[in-house]
C-alpha cells in the first residue's frame, strides 16, 4: 500500500498537483509508534500544505511550540502549515507570516470529523478561488479561507456523526447568523 501511495504522489508531484497532508494520526491502527512516525516523516516532503493538531505537532516534531517547529516543517515543497487548535481556532503559517482565526464558542455534540471538515473547507476555498500559486494568495484571501474553514469545522461539532454534520452553503449561512457573525466570506481582499 505504501508503495502505491508513493507512486501516486510522485505522479502528482510531476504533474504539478497541489498536495495537502493531514497526518490524522490513528495510534490504535499501528503496533509501533516509531513505525507510524517514520511513515509520516516519509510522506511529509510531498506536502504543499500540512495540517497539524497539537498532538500531531508534538508527535512528529518532538516540540509543543509551533513557532519552534516551523523551520523543521516549512521546507521543501511545503508552503503552508495549518495548525488547528480546536475551540481556540487555527493559524496558517507561511514563510514570514502567520494568519490566525479565532475559534467559535458552540455547544459541542461530537468532534468526529471536525479536522477533516476544516481542511476540506479550506481546500474548497482554494479550489473555488482557482489560484494555483500558494505564494501569490493574499493575506486577506487566506484570512477569509481560514475563517470559513474554522466556521465549517465549528458547525461540524454541533451535530452527531461526521457525515450528518457536513453542511451545505445555506445551512452554514444559517449557522453563521446564529453566531451573530457579520463576516462575509466572498471578499477577495
Describe each region flagged by the PLM.
Residues 1-72, 88-89:
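Conserved beta-alpha-beta core of the PfkB/ribokinase-like small-molecule kinase fold
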Residues 10-11, 64-189:
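Conserved phosphate-binding/catalytic region of the ribokinase-like
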